[in-house]
A protein has these predicted regions:
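Switch II of P-loop NTPase G domains
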Residues: 18, 54-63, 76-106, 114-128
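Conserved G1/Walker A P-loop phosphate-binding module
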Residues: 1-82, 193
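Conserved C-terminal guanine-recognition region of P-loop GTPase G domains, centered on the G4
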Residues: 96-168
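Glycine-rich, phosphate-binding/catalytic loops in enzymes
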Residues: 45-46, 88-91, 125-128, 154-157, ...
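Canonical P-loop GTPase G-domain recognition
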Residues: 3-16, 145-200
């Protein structure tokens, strides 16, 4: 797959309304404004498939995209300070319900900003994924903001941070210039292929 046949399906704020899980699902998680929409657009070679929000933390929905023979599942961003406790609880319920349902959870892409150490919310998410044995890789975003001399050291630092939480792989990426996108596409393709093999 090269992720070029991509369509937005719908946004879901209630877990019971999620579409039937009839194919592999690649989900994307991260802090508000970490660059999820930009990364999804770059993976699919589209500019406006996933809309980039100018109001972080306002989207308490799970967005589904039909991409070739799988789903891209954009989970709501977390860590926005101005969100009410009621909204936080609703987001927690939505995400818990998604992962607890018997769906084709093929692989999750956890996004982290490569310029900063993981926040408390990021580490909480890594612990959640590890505890629930959800297979995931980390995509470090905004690699275009680093100097070339910083790339290898940054990746190594994050590998050391994420490895104890069960992370399978760390990939440096940029939604701006496409850095690391082919590598991440290959990781996602391999995960979908393995899922399809098991289903046969």
């Amino acid at each position: 797959m090269i992720f070029n046949k991509a369509d937005f399906i719908a946004s879901y704020g209630i877990s019971s309304l999620l579409p039937e899980s009839d194919r592999p699902e690649l989900s994307f998680s991260g802090r508000s404004n970490v660059g999820k929409s930009s990364l999804i657009n770059k993976l699919c070679s589209r500019k406006n498939l996933a809309r980039v929000s100018s109001t972080p933390g306002k989207t308490a929905t799970i967005n589904f995209y039909s991409v070739d023979d799988c789903y891209f599942v954009d989970l709501p961003g977390y860590g926005y300070a101005k969100v009410s406790n009621a909204d936080r609880e609703r987001w927690d319920d939505l995400i818990n319900s998604y992962f607890e349902a018997p769906r084709h959870h093929t692989l999750l892409v956890q996004l982290l900003d490569c310029r900063h150490a993981p926040s408390a919310d990021d580490l909480q998410m890594l612990r959640y994924l590890h505890y629930h044995r959800i297979p995931y890789v980390v995509a470090l975003t905004k690699a275009d903001k680093l100097k070339k001399s910083q790339l290898a050291k940054t990746q190594e630092d994050f590998e050391n941070i994420c490895r104890p939480y069960g992370c399978q792989k760390v990939v440096l990426t940029s939604g701006e210039n496409g850095y690391g996108i082919p590598e991440l596409q290959a990781v996602l393709n391999a995960a979908v292929a393995a899922e399809n093999e098991e289903a046969e």
